[in-house]
Amino acid sequence: MTTSESSATSSVKIYFRLLSYVRPYVGIFLLSIIGFVIFASTQPMLAGILKYFVDGLTNPEAVLFPNVPYLRELQLLQAVPLLIVLIAAWQGLGSFLGNYFLAKVSLGLVHDLRVELFNKLLVLPNRYFDTTNSGHLISRITFNVTMVTGAATDAIKVVIREGLTVVFLFIYLLMMNWKLTLVMLAILPLIAVMVGTASKKFRKQSKKIQVAMGDVTHVASETIQGYRVVRSFGGEAYEQARFAQASNSNTQKQLRMTKTGAIYTPMLQLVIYSAMAVLMFLVLFLRGEATAGDLVAYITAAGLLPKPIRQLSEVSSTIQKGVAGAESIFEQLDVEEEVDTGTIERERVTGHLEVKNLSFFYPQTARQVLNDISFSAAPGQMIALVGRSGSGKSTLANLIPRFYGHDIGNILLDGVEINDYRLRNLRRHIAQVNQNVTLFNDTIANNIAYGDLAGAPRADIEAAAADAYAREFIDQLPQGFDTQVGENGVLLSGGQRQRLAIARALLKNAPLLILDEATSALDTESERHIQAALDHVMKGRTTLVIAHRLSTIEKADLILVMDAGQIVERGTHTELLAQNGYYARLHAMGLDEPAPVGAV
């Protein structure tokens, strides 16, 4: 099979898969088809009525239906105007049924695809987000889905409505003069070749447009999210140039596709009208015994053909845009979800954590991030991970809730390998607070009681906020817990956001706490309050703390000193200082040694 044949086969498979999304709307879709059948049937009627109009010019008293009872007295003088009005009404009914019900299918399809894409995002593994441009993900949900809908509904609208129009007109022409009609059929192979050539170009160009649109979304998203950095470092000109370049690239690709269509459509029209010219010559040359009305009706019907044929040929562009968009959408939908082969569910675990000979490589890289890590933590113990940035601390913390899967070594929670737990159940036992806090554009109360915590009693929410020392600023806000925090908590300070994240973790009341730089954004006073709260909360819970501040880790039951993915020292704060080794050097520098170049 050649490359072009393989591509064509792939396009057909993608398109039929896309059409499967129309299945839930098949009843509404059939109503739209009926509407388009009605619409298409009026085209030869209009041509036919002209025959009687022209014949009526020579004999106004002639009747339209001489052999039909009750209508044999109806003269052309009355019948022709009446029929034109009736045909127009019939056509309007068909147009309404077709367009309205197809719009319902189209909008439903947009909704279904967007929801499925978004739902898929929530179950994709972390590694997918590590390697995929966020702008392209957003563009798929917004731009690509619209292109796909055009292929699944708008294209079908043209194919059905204009296709039936062509069929009905050809039937009418064959009935009037089959020999002349065969002349028009002779151009169909040439039209097919032109459509096939244009389709390949349209699909190739559509893929490039969608990638370029993703780049535009990505640059805009990055700049909006980092607007403070942009302004602080005078990056306005750079970002303006970067966005202009991305937008210009998209514009040029759009123009290239428009140019293809602008060349292709006139060429197709030239072929069609050349055939019409030959047909008109033959009609005049071979008119024989045909009446003037017959000739006018035939030419009118033939003259109605170029428009639907042109629209049918142009639908290839819409279909190829949709196929290109659907290909990227289905690629995302076909990505394997997070591995969840576990079967064990526990109502609550004690929090006994044990790591045995754990090693880890990030997917699709050959560099080892963790090497033979082993330690254990009993309920109520606090384990502190210390080391310069890039030593593997956060990677280790991300393996415990299975944000990444491990293949070498074991991580046991209450004596059970974490891979044996059902994923959702495992994460229910873990509360995590990261350095980069995520808040949603909602109220303070809803940000604390998020996800599975939604619906928690207001008293519990307020108690968690108090334990996180967040009440002192919440009570000063005009709407208190009902205050909107803005996108990602933009209306709050860094320390306030951090305390809300800690309150969220406290409300979860999980037996295992992971605090990844959890107090790094707090001022000294806030950190002192948080430390007091954490001392209380950590009782009876396993706590894994990653911190650069001495005050956070000095009380740890066990400190694991990491470097280059290995545990190089372990012990209490006092024991490690007495060893006068790596930890002592970090301690002397304030525990915040920069990462080496290339560290992960």
UniProtKB/Swiss-Prot annotation:
CDD domains: ABC_6TM_MsbA_like. It is found in: Cell inner membrane. It catalyses: ATP + H2O + lipid A-core oligosaccharideSide 1 = ADP + phosphate + lipid A-core oligosaccharideSide 2. Involved in lipopolysaccharide (LPS) biosynthesis. Translocates lipid A-core from the inner to the outer leaflet of the inner membrane. Transmembrane domains (TMD) form a pore in the inner membrane and the ATP-binding domain (NBD) is responsible for energy generation. One of its GO terms (cellular component) is plasma membrane. SMART domains: AAA. Keywords: ATP-binding, Cell inner membrane, Cell membrane, Lipid transport, Membrane, Nucleotide-binding, Translocase, Transmembrane, Transmembrane helix, Transport. GO terms for molecular function: ABC-type oligopeptide transporter activity; ATP binding; ATP hydrolysis activity; ATPase-coupled lipid transmembrane transporter activity. Residues 30-321 form the ABC transmembrane type-1 domain. It is a multi-pass membrane protein. It comes from Pseudomonas syringae pv. syringae (strain B728a). ATP binds at residues 387-394. This is ATP-dependent lipid A-core flippase. In MsbA the ATP-binding domain (NBD) and the transmembrane domain (TMD) are fused. SUPFAM superfamilies: ABC transporter transmembrane region (SSF90123), P-loop containing nucleoside triphosphate hydrolases (SSF52540). Pfam families: ABC_membrane, ABC_tran. Its main location: membrane. It comes from the Bacteria. Its EC number is 7.5.2.6. The lineage of its organism: Bacteria, Pseudomonadati, Pseudomonadota, Gammaproteobacteria, Pseudomonadales. Belongs to the ABC transporter superfamily. Lipid exporter (TC 3.A.1.106) family. Homodimer. Residues 353-589 form the ABC transporter domain.
